[in-house]
């Protein structure tokens, strides 16, 4: 059951398309959080090791909005009352959808993740931003299926936005970095091209994106 208190209640939001057809699926392997593709309908996690996810955003009021991907954990697969958390690892990057895929530009606005009273926004500078925890009830026969609200100020403009984060569970090693490719108002062909780029270029060499983000931040500081 979703416990998230939806900030926005809008009928007919655009459907969400996933590169991998599901939520962030979390499990524990050898003492470490591992990601895969969560299917809450079938109550399974597939494609273990998947680290690239995707969603479409809808323009709702002053924000681009999504409530996907959610987080899915199989019933009884983690200690009861574990805190399921996350860390946003870098500023959100943006590609305007023209020319070759290029995530060298930082978004002019942060992405904010909200779940009930909890809220955290990505940084405009290099470095980690600690998120919040959501309680895991191991006794829920339907498993853990929670969805936060993803908000991006519409002033950032249409584009493809790339969010990098890792997941945390108390008592276990954090997950590897994951990347979520959000489509704000562009075609699915452009979205697919961005997803392919992240899967083939950024995931094998994540340090390249971190270096780009760091260079942008340093440049912004020098210009002040």
Describe each model-derived feature in a short phrase:
Residues 9, 198-202, 217:
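Generic secondary-structure transition motif, activating predominantly at the C-termini of alpha-helices
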Residues 1-4, 220-224:
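Positively charged n-region of N-terminal signal peptides that target proteins for export
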């Amino acid at each position: 059951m979703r416990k998230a208190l939806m900030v926005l209640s809008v009928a007919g939001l655009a459907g969400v398309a996933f590169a991998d057809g599901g939520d962030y699926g979390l499990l524990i392997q050898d003492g470490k959080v591992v990601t895969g593709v969560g299917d809450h309908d079938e109550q399974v996690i597939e494609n273990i090791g998947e680290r690239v996810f995707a969603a479409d955003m809808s323009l709702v009021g002053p924000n681009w909005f999504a409530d996907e991907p959610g987080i899915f954990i199989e019933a009884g697969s983690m200690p009861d009352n574990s805190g399921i958390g996350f860390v946003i690892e870098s500023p959100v990057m943006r590609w305007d959808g023209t020319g070759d895929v290029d995530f060298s530009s930082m978004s002019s606005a942060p992405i904010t993740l909200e779940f009930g009273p909890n809220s955290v926004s990505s940084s405009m500078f290099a470095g980690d931003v600690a998120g919040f925890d959501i309680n895991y009830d191991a006794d829920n026969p339907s498993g853990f299926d929670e969805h936060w609200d993803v908000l991006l100020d519409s002033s950032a403009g249409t584009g493809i936005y790339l969010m990098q984060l890792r997941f945390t569970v108390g008592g276990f090693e954090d997950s590897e970095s994951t990347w979520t490719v959000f489509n704000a108002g562009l075609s699915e062909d452009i979205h697919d091209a961005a997803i392919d780029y992240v899967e083939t270029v950024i995931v094998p060499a994540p340090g390249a994106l971190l270096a780009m983000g760091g260079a942008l931040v340093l440049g912004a500081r020098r210009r002040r």
